[in-house]
């Protein structure tokens, strides 16, 4: 075999340029970038060195043949032509990886089988023995890539992917691969900072990947020094003496690096469950004397060991996948920016984010941005110099520079639109707050798309804020809509003086007549609120709605006033808040019907919270079917149906516009002489069927069912009072 080989280094998408620089420094010649790979030439020693020292590659492939292929047979013949006895003992084990399509091979599994058959047949024809297949830990891992009729046949020198350094046996929910973390550190300038004796800190360190990779760079430790099993370990072309020399040299460099005074490397993690796994990973990497991890959140991390120390703050904030994450992530970025301005003046910072728009909310400009991919997710690396002239808030360049401990910390400056939104909230709070205090109301709507460009509903639940974003029409640029949402979320805590963690945000789609809302998350946290002398449970996080329809407050209070001594029926009862009011008002009995077991359980809790249980009947069922079967009489009926509903537990689909006549006829058949039925719904295009007025005394009462907080939006619902003629 020649001692000059074609080598292909694979890597995550976006790392090709960095990998080319690294591989060239390690001896690769004539290197050039390909998609998710670097190709070049070098002696076997270069291949070994790349396996040992590359912080960025996934695999090091040694090309043993290139040949044209037009079909499965020419693929087989091209692989069969290789003298496999030079590479693998007939009694050894083999794994084949196949990528690409073409030449009549559109199935990678079929392609891998043809490659395997060719290797096995060649070895068996020479010795009578055949190798076994071991996909997990083979003696030889063969890779074939098919591209535009050209087959590239390689041996995988690395074995398992090189990002698997061996120290990270425990990890968090969404870890960065080690080679991606190393690439981010290199782009952030950590090798330069480390060479100058700088510090490294990660305020959201998870299980410490950035910290370990950074410490290995600073201590001159080869990333795969501790790997015991390689793709070349049982390869017949392996030269142990050459490998042992390179490994011994790397071992000596690591020992010398660790003998130097350690740099100041610290991590902080808010989740206590990740602290010990992170420490275990650090210990496995042999870096316990270099790295410390502490429990702490972004707002309290202390990156500065002394007033003169400078360094790099690096982090990978969570991406956010649940409903309401926009608010928590916005405030996380704001907290990070505040802490950088407060404690890290003169430092550099690197924020790896899948939401670069949130990066703008930190209040510090980034001077460079790099595109990366985390798997299939496009991300940006924001590089920041924590200097006064980079602050979006606080003092500008030319001002007298304070001492580091006096660095200004201010709330993120609001945009012009954000300030207008904040002013509107404060104006509404002055007006509605006075009314709410006078009426003893704890929960009310503060803002309802008063400014068209900020299409939100903002509700107060005691000292919590519940924000619903109306989905923008297709004519609105989604990026502009997202920017306005972030402006609003930045303004709300400042305008209302409410802690950021008490702001919950959700998105509400415009009603189409075909949508209904499902459970959004599962936190199970309930808040007790009061209304009209009753206590009610709301859940601000788990569902699109909270368990309490604020716009129906006047109707619930009317029911409480009229319920004394009456038999009350609540259809589509939801969490039975109207039932609680009826019971409070002295109803002789109550019956509440809903299809959802979850909401009926919630209703039971609402009733129990107020001491009601004996005479309160909760029925699970399809309301239409239940009414057809029921033979009871009721003096007071309340119906607030959804616009649209379907379920496995009901026959057909309920549509309020189509089905309201049948619904009201069934309900009026159950109304006792002299009784009253209240009907309300929130479908904006709803039209009450005129034929109902021929059969019943019908009075629209919408105006009297709107309190001060909903008079700006008189179409929030419509309501009618029905009685027998």
Curated annotation (Swiss-Prot):
Subcellular location: Cytoplasm
Entry keywords, A to Z: Cytoplasm, Methyltransferase, RNA-binding, rRNA processing, S-adenosyl-L-methionine, Transferase
A single MF term (Gene Ontology): 23S rRNA (guanine(2445)-N(2))-methyltransferase activity
Catalytic activity, EC: 2.1.1.173, 2.1.1.264
Gene Ontology terms: cellular component: cytoplasm
Keyword set includes S-adenosyl-L-methionine: yes
InterPro entries: 23SrRNA_methyltr_KL (IPR017244), DNA_methylase_N6_adenine_CS (IPR002052), RlmKL-like_Mtase (IPR000241), RlmL_1st (IPR054170), SAM-dep_methyl-trfase (IPR019614), SAM-dependent_MTases_sf (IPR029063), THUMP_dom (IPR004114)
Protein's name according to its UniProt entry: Ribosomal RNA large subunit methyltransferase K/L
Species name: Stutzerimonas stutzeri (strain A1501) (Pseudomonas stutzeri)
Origin organism lineage: Bacteria, Pseudomonadati, Pseudomonadota, Gammaproteobacteria, Pseudomonadales
Gene label: rlmL
